[in-house]
Amino acid sequence: MRRGPQVALVLGLLCIYLAQANFAPHFFDNGVGSTNGNMALFSLPEDTPVGSHVYTLNGTDPEGDPISYHISFDPSTRSVFSVDPNFGNITLVEELDREREDEIEAIISISDGLNLVAEKVVIVVTDANDEAPRFLQEPYNILVPENTPAGSSIFKVQAEDKDTGSGGSVTYFLQSLHSSKFTVDRHSGVLRLQAGATLDYEKSRAHFITVVAKDGGGRLRGADVVFSATTTVTINVEDVQDTAPIFVGTPYYGYVYEDTLPGSEVLTVVAIDGDRGKPNHILYRLLNESDGLFEINETSGAISVLQSPAQLRREVYELHVQVTEVNSSGSPAAQSTVPVIIRIVDLNNHPPTFYGESGPQNKFELSMFEHPPQGEILRGLKITVNDSDQGANAKFNLRLVGPGGIFRVVPQTVLNEAQVTIIVENSAAIDFEKSKSLTFKLLAIEVNTPEKFSSTADIVIQLLDTNDNVPKFTSHYYIARIPENVPGGSNVVAVTAVDPDTGPWGKVQYSIYGTGSDLFLIHPSTGLIYTQPWASLDAEGTSRYNFYVKAEDMDGRYSLAEVFVTLLDVNDHYPQFVQSVQEKTMVLGTPLKIEATDQDAEEPNNLVDYSITRAEPVNVFDIDAHTGEIRLKNSIRSLEALHNITPSGEYSWSLQVQAKDRGSPSFSTTALLKIDITDTERLSRSSMAAFLIQTKDNPMKAVGVLAGVMAIVVAITVLISTATFWRNKKSNKVLPVRRVLRRRPSPAPHTVRIEWLKFRRAKAASKFILKEDPPNENCNNSRVGVTVPPRAPALPPPPKMASSTVAQQTVPTVSGSLTPQPSQQLPTPKPLGGPAQSSLVSELKQKFEKKSLGNKAYV
């Protein structure tokens, strides 16, 4: 009973104790590399941007009470971080710099409101490549002797980089225009004179080289970066005595004028020690004194002449001057020599002068033929030019003054004296016909003297004529028009040719030749063209002549011109009727026509007018004066009217018709015309007879009508055969024509008509007069049933001047008439003036006949 209350008491006290106990919160320790916990062994790169969330404090309270976080720093240090008290997020608020502060001490704490737990942490700042190399002990100025051996070490540069690792390692290299003479060790920074290189104080007293120091690179803000630095090393070259004296102002030329006094200074030679850093004293002397003509001052280097220049024999003297260095101890050192050229200058007191074979001369004459060969030398001119001065005063130019481009003078530049040569440059310009003589001035003028002395000489060239021109006509062609009835020996036209050459070469001889020249002559001296004494010209035979006329000089040089002669027609032919007595039949109401021809060549001589000069009885017929158509007067309209006019009551009349040309004077011819008059009723009784009567005077009309009828019959036959063939073709069968003819025989009237036409055609053709048998055009070797076409007589042979290769052909024309007529004698053509004129045919007529024969050969 007693133990129960005690136990209860103990339990009660325990509960009260437990209720009043509160345990402290604590941080989690998550180890290295964790971004939350108690920041144990936490490190942070120095390039972390300000404001970055870098860590999260994380802890807990055993009772589960709310906790808060805090971070604090030593008052003597910076507050680098801040913390969110509720969530424990730590933020960087200051930039980190490992080179200044590689560790940061901080106190972090956690509290549940009653208990506060604090811990001291060390935050390691890790390196980033944020530092560039930096050279130590700048600036770099060093002194190096110029005789330093190649490959020697001359200096060492040093740079440091505060970064660690590769970012803190430094390498060196050169970046300079003079890097070809120097080199640097990339690891140690030692500068050396490159192998094969030398220093020369006299050429370059200082060298400036740029050395670059570069780190090994590293990460910075998430990128790989490399930093570098540069410095300039000034290398001053120290002079040493290693160079001979140097002459200043070389080369040395001195001039002594011929009026210079003895003892006058000519020029001064200047030399300096080649080692300019520590120069020695210089002494001068002449190695050759030129026979005592010149001397030199040993300290100043001044050279003087000792004698009068007029006594000097040479124009140019060459001296050799030697200089010697004297060191501080007074002993000779390095030496040098230099040549000195001294020229004796002549005064310009003589102008250039021209000389001939007998002495000074200012005029030269020469005779030569025109048009000499290109490049020929005028050997007849003996010219010498001289300038008595010396040197530049005796230098002058030569040139010709006058018409340019004809001659060229050689030489063009002369020193002292030269033989003058004149060469032909333009042969065409040396023309006797243009100029009988050529005059030039030969000018010599000094080149480099201020006085510019000059001299001139006249050159006169007399030209001799040669036969270099061809006679030339005043025109390329001559046109003449003469009447056809001019008598023989009449003047036609005068041609003129001119030869500008002189003497016998300028005389011109004329001659003519060519087709059409046989009827003409030319005076050999005057060029007058006239007709042959026996020539008889006829415009109706040949109306135009053309030939060539030649003008020739005595050497055979010639030119040609063409002459055209046109014959003017003269009314010398009478109109001619075909027959002097003609019989014609006139159908009442239809005119008939008569025709006369006039053989004159041109109008109006060959135009014919017709008139009735006599009629019995009169006032029955009218005639058209231009066409020759004869018709009854309008008042006569029937045979009864005609019957009442004649006393005998006949229908036949005799008329005398006149044909008169329009020439001046005019010619006329008359013919007797017998006319039989009938009317249409009589002709209708026999249509064929009427047709024959109507075509009595025109047989070709009858032939044409018959040929037309035959052509129509043949065409109808061809159409019937073609239609039959195409009809059978549609049924894929080809039937012989004979079968078609049997099925469909020709109507009887057609047969009668064709037989009648054949009869008439054979009857009419029997009256034709054929000159030769026609060829077998059907090529069947059978002439039975073949109608022979009429043929005209063969053409006469072509003229002798025509080509013999043209074949003679026959012309298929009708040579008969439907009604026989008594033969009529054609008028005899007028002779062409004898055998000479009959053989003369113009070229135009020949071409026309050739063309006509060629065309007929293909008919």
Swiss-Prot record:
Keywords: Calcium, Cell adhesion, Cell membrane, Glycoprotein, Membrane, Receptor, Repeat, Signal, Transmembrane, Transmembrane helix. GO terms for biological process: cell adhesion; homophilic cell adhesion via plasma membrane adhesion molecules; photoreceptor cell maintenance; photoreceptor cell morphogenesis; photoreceptor cell outer segment organization. PROSITE patterns: CADHERIN_1, CADHERIN_2. Residues 817-827 have a biased composition (Low complexity). Residues 789-859 are annotated as: Disordered. The chain crosses the membrane at residues 702-722. Undergoes proteolytic cleavage; produces a soluble 95 kDa N-terminal fragment and a 25 kDa cell-associated C-terminal fragment. Gene3D superfamilies: Cadherins (2.60.40.60). Residues 36-135, 136-247, 248-354, 360-473, 474-577, 569-691 form the Cadherin domain. Pfam families: Cadherin (PF00028). Residues 723-859 are cytoplasmic. It is found in: Cell membrane. This is Cadherin-related family member 1. It comes from Rattus norvegicus (Rat).
